[in-house]
Curated annotation (Swiss-Prot):
Role summary: Forms part of the ribosomal stalk which helps the ribosome interact with GTP-bound translation factors. Is thus essential for accurate translation.
A Pfam family that the UniProt record links to this protein: Ribosomal_L12
InterPro entries: Ribosomal_bL12 (IPR000206), Ribosomal_bL12_C (IPR013823), Ribosomal_bL12_C/ClpS-like (IPR014719), Ribosomal_bL12_oligo (IPR008932), Ribosomal_bL12_oligo_N_sf (IPR036235)
Assembly, per entry: Homodimer. Part of the ribosomal stalk of the 50S ribosomal subunit. Forms a multimeric L10(L12)X complex, where L10 forms an elongated spine to which 2 to 4 L12 dimers bind in a sequential fashion. Binds GTP-bound translation factors.
The organism's place on the tree of life at top rank: Eukaryota
Entry-linked SUPFAM superfamilies: ClpS-like (SSF54736), Ribosomal protein L7/12, oligomerisation (N-terminal) domain (SSF48300)
Lineage, top ranks: Eukaryota, Viridiplantae, Chlorophyta, core chlorophytes, Trebouxiophyceae
GO biological process: translation
Subcellular location: Plastid
Organism: Prototheca wickerhamii
Protein name as it appears in the record: Large ribosomal subunit protein bL12c
Keyword terms: Plastid, Ribonucleoprotein, Ribosomal protein
Amino acid sequence: MSATTLEILEKLKAITLLEATELVSQIEKTFGVDASAPAVSGLRPILVEPIKQEDIIEEKTTFDVILEEVPSDKRVPILKVIRALTSLDLKQAKESITDLPKTILQGVSKEESEAAKQQLEAVGGKIKVS
């Protein structure tokens, strides 16, 4: 090791933790490096950007089927489908199509929500899956 290297090393041994932190910060700024990334011999350092919260996309696993609109001439067929999809009795099913929008199915799988949407749209209902 050269005399200059030994001199720098001895000075580094004597500095405080706060001074060492400031030194690392200045080295990162001056040389454009990231001291937190481990150095691997023979490989160039790879700069990695931190993952931002908005970059993380969570895929939904449960869905709600919401009945938004019922044409007056399609009420009976829609009632039949609602009763087939749910455990609602006739009175509850009628109430579900008068006070819209109304959640028909809640917390169901994607496949189940899509099947319900297709059935209800086939008889004239306007459906939203969320």
